[in-house]
């Protein structure tokens, strides 16, 4: 280990920054955020330093560096574009046993500054020891995506609860289980982020009052249309915290590969060799797993509240008093249209878009007259088996037979396939496509020839 990672308490302590340019500004921001009493020395300063000085946030000393500026300092940073000046600052600091960082010259410095993920009071530092700053930055960006923005608020709140938790739970094991439940409670984290004191109090009291083994919850997560890159950051965080993931066939293998390795996986979709699990049975699976005290993720393709029956599942949980939350996903209409070069709205062709289910409960009927109106785009979910009926009804209610249509199979996936034509051909076109597929009807489909980008990659 070439460097010892430490966190310095600089609040109200004198620090010196030598340099007045853009690089020095970035260092100054970090020192000010840490509460340092900062003096900045340079021959000239960019405007931001003057702004800070006028606000009383730091002291500017214009002119050449002098060793006396280090008097009383705890820490120094040399951030000029003059190597000789930087070396002078480093040597002067070294002689006084003051730690000094020299920008872009780790061998000349007595300390280096890592890439930082700030979720105060939680801090994560990443460093390559100065050998590969770009690698450290890329790793920091990866970690940033995995750590929720509100994590710091959760950590701060946990600090307020420590004494009470220690008093209520006698053993270390009980305390550990409680803290694990608290740190992955998405409803609590969201309430803290929203400064909803009432909800925070209610959730906390519920967690403290119930037996530890009976504090399960369900998170309804939209997996997006297929491409794993379209899964939201919050969705990724949830599937990596799950004890059990209940999923269907619209969730891609690439997304399932991101699920926490030791999580149980329950498949409830329809696949060759399997029977489709009835919705009521799915509801009971969610209920049963949550009642075991487990963190359950119900992972659904697209967005769970757009033809995903998410509302029905949550009604069951609500009736049973099971805590739940929802993470929306990119719905298939948005993903498939974007990846097939079909804008759902366009000033010249469509001022509205309608998302329509291709099948209803028994006895249901669509409002075909309004669906056949001009200047709109129709997107039919689960409509492949009803394509001939959709064609017949739309034409019967006045839509032109030459209206452009597109069928998007496996939208956003590497194996995406798009079949296009006109409304009069829809029934026949559907025979060329396999589920899962989406039907898009509207003048905007004609733009596909110009705007299609995905198939070219």
Curated annotation (Swiss-Prot):
Residues annotated as catalytic: 248 (proton acceptor), 270 (proton donor)
Pathway membership, UniProt: Cofactor biosynthesis; adenosylcobalamin biosynthesis; precorrin-2 from uroporphyrinogen III: step 1/1; Cofactor biosynthesis; adenosylcobalamin biosynthesis; sirohydrochlorin from precorrin-2: step 1/1; Porphyrin-containing compound metabolism; siroheme biosynthesis; precorrin-2 from uroporphyrinogen III: step 1/1; Porphyrin-containing compound metabolism; siroheme biosynthesis; siroheme from sirohydrochlorin: step 1/1
PTM-bearing positions, type Phosphoserine: 128
Location of the region described as Precorrin-2 dehydrogenase /sirohydrochlorin ferrochelatase in the Swiss-Prot/TrEMBL record: 1-204
Residues noted as binding S-adenosyl-L-methionine in the record, renumbered to the chain: 225, 301-303, 306, 331-332, 382, 411
Function: Then it catalyzes the NAD-dependent ring dehydrogenation of precorrin-2 to yield sirohydrochlorin. Finally, it catalyzes the ferrochelation of sirohydrochlorin to yield siroheme.
Protein's name in the database: Siroheme synthase
Species this protein is from: Citrobacter koseri (strain ATCC BAA-895 / CDC 4225-83 / SGSC4696)
């Amino acid at each position: 280990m070439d460097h010892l990672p430490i966190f310095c308490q600089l609040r109200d302590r004198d620090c010196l920054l030598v340099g007045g340019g853009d690089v020095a500004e970035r260092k100054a921001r970090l020192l000010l955020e840490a509460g340092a009493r900062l003096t900045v020395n340079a021959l000239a300063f960019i405007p931001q330093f003057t702004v800070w000085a006028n606000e009383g946030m730091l002291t500017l000393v214009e002119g050449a560096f002098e060793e006396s500026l280090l008097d009383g300092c705890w820490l120094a940073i040399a951030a000029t574009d003059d190597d000789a000046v930087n070396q002078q600052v480093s040597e002067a600091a070294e002689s006084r046993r003051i730690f000094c960082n020299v920008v872009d010259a780790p061998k000349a410095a007595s300390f280096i500054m890592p890439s930082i993920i700030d979720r105060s009071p939680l801090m994560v530092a990443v460093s390559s020891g100065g050998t590969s700053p770009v690698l450290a930055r890329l790793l920091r960006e990866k970690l940033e995506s995995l750590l929720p923005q509100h994590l710091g608020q959760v950590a701060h709140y946990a600090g307020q609860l420590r004494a009470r938790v220690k008093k209520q739970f006698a053993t270390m094991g009980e305390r550990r289980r409680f803290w694990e439940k608290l740190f992955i409670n998405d409803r609590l984290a969201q309430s803290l982020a929203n400064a909803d004191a009432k909800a925070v109090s209610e959730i906390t009291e519920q967690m403290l009052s119930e037996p530890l083994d009976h504090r399960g919850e369900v998170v309804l997560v939209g997996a997006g249309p297929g491409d794993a890159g379209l899964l939201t950051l919050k969705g990724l965080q949830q599937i990596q915290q799950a004890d059990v993931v209940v999923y269907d066939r619209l969730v891609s293998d690439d997304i399932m590969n991101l699920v926490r390795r030791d999580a149980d996986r329950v498949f409830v979709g329809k696949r060759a060799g399997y029977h489709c699990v009835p919705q009521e049975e799915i509801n009971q699976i969610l209920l049963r797993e949550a009642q075991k005290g487990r963190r359950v993720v119900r992972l659904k393709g697209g967005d769970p509240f757009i033809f995903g029956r998410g509302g029905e599942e949550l009604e069951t949980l609500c009736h049973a008093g099971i805590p739940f939350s929802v993470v929306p996903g990119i719905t298939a209409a948005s993903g498939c249209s974007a990846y097939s070069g079909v804008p759902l709205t366009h000033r010249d062709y469509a001022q509205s878009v309608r998302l329509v289910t291709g099948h209803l409960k028994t006895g249901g009927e669509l409002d075909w007259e309004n669906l056949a109106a001009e200047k709109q785009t129709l997107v039919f979910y689960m409509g492949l088996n009803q394509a001939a009926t959709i064609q017949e009804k739309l034409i019967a209610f006045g839509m032109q037979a030459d209206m452009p249509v597109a069928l998007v199979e496996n939208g956003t996936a590497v194996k995406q396939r798009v079949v296009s034509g006109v409304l009069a051909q829809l029934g026949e076109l559907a025979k060329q496509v396999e589920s899962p597929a989406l039907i898009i009807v509207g003048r905007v489909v004609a733009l596909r020839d110009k705007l299609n980008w995905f198939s070219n990659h």
